[in-house]
Amino acid sequence: MRAELAHANTPAIVRAWISQPPQWLEVVSLKQPVDSALAHLEAGEREAISLASELQAILLLMDERDGVTIARHRGLKVVGTLAALDLAAAHGLVELQTMFERLRATTFRSPVRLMVSMLEQDAERKKRQEG
């Protein structure tokens, strides 16, 4: 996965981030070979699903539709990037608007109306917390 983030086709902002990752990021290698049944997926998804299974992870962060379907079929709990950011925003760890702006600087794509709806819900949540 690290190689995918550092690839020349990856946006510069992402390559810069992975070149000096935050201290909380732990890079873990697979102990077993990648499951050959996942060969039709991209390398990052194959490795993520295999590692999540190997580690018996409680949660897998993944957005690629085919990978999500297979991971869930294998009993893994999967959350997408937007849901993870929304959860972090709900706990006051990030500012959702800022995170969405940063995502737009990458190759990440999501329906604009979904992101607008999430920002509206975030604003409502903040009002409830204030008042």
How does the language model describe each region?
Residues 1-59, 65-77, 98, 102-104, ...:
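Active-site-proximal, substrate-binding regions of enzyme catalytic domains
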Residues 64-65, 82:
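Alpha-helix N-cap/helix-start capping motif
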Residues 76-86:
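Short hydrophobic/aromatic-enriched beta-strand-loop microsegments
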